[in-house]
Amino acid sequence: MDSSELHRRRAYRAQERRRRRLRRRIAAFAGLVVVIAAAAVAVAATGGASSPTTTTSATSHRRAVARHSAHGTAGRSATSGGTGHRTAGGSTAAALGPATGHAGTDSVPILMYHVIAAPPAGAPYPGLYVTPQEFTAQMEALKQAGWTAVTLDQVRAYWADGARLPAGKPVVITFDNGYHSQYAQALPVLRRLGWVADENIQLTGLPPSQGGMTSGQVRALVRAGWELDTQGMSHADLATSDPAELRYQIVTARRLLRREYGVPVNWFCYPSGQYNAAVIAAVRAAGFVGSTTVVPGWASRSGDPYRLPRLRVLGGTSPSALLSQIAGARGDGAPPSTYMTS
């Protein structure tokens, strides 16, 4: 080996040593940055409440999302535009931050309603009909017992970000499908109490005996502070749907509702409570921050946000029975990975 080759090799080894030292310095600096960032997050988590992120968007003179009807015959939709304002969801935190609302609120009951009307003769599921009188008495009893209605977005912001909740014991009131009676009967009662609710709307296929809300009525709910969520396009059995149908039912429904009403649509409601791992994955991939089931129990801070339990309120439930139902369900266990029921 001549002297020039030896010199080149020594120079190359020296250059490699300098590169290794530089990489070690960069790695050490990156580690320091991570430690500083973690400390900053910890300090922020122990500080005061932070304001939830909000998303405000407008849509004007758009076509109606869909006709809320049975086989295209019942219900109608409006074409005027509107705006909405709602707390937007971000990524779900693995470890949720401190709460600053009602003391000890690590779990919250979520009530489930369907039709607010007397059941017609021959109704296939009469138990899903709660009369306006029953609903009014139930809401007044909740108010008197110290409960306050909040939305799922508010609960999530409280658990994840430390945002404040209204005074009182929080309860989430959900309405499935998008029945006209929810607008006509439930909205006035909740508005009088200063309360809000979550509307899990499906875009097509409602029974002709009730029909669906018009786009204008949906906007009225949004203006009243209701949260707009969805059960998909047509309340299909998602547990038996192929991937293409899942995308249509889940992704398309969220996209159309967001475009039409200018709200985030952060939560999905499994139609008839039917879901499996593939459905959960599709819901998560579509951008939803969580989902509600029909499994009885309270939703908890430590639970799976894509398997939130709910309490079904049936027709004939007295105010005292509802309060007992809520209290008795608090100790229920976590929902199973799949739950098939109607």
Please place each PLM-identified region on the residue numbering:
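Terminal targeting segments of Actinobacterial cell-envelope proteins
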Residues: 1-24
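Hydrophobic membrane-insertion alpha-helices, especially the h-region
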Residues: 29-40
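C-terminal region of N-terminal signal peptides and the immediate post-cleavage residues
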Residues: 38-62
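Juxtamembrane proline-rich low-complexity "stalk" or linker regions positioned immediately after a signal peptide
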Residues: 54-85
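C-terminal active-site subregion of NodB/CE4 polysaccharide deacetylases
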Residues: 80, 84-174, 179-183, 216-219, ...
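A short alpha/beta connector and helix-capping loop motif
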Residues: 183-203
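Short beta-strand and adjacent tight-turn residues that come in two discontinuous sequence segments
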Residues: 200, 231, 291-293
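Active-site glycine- and acidic-residue-rich loops that bind
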Residues: 206-211
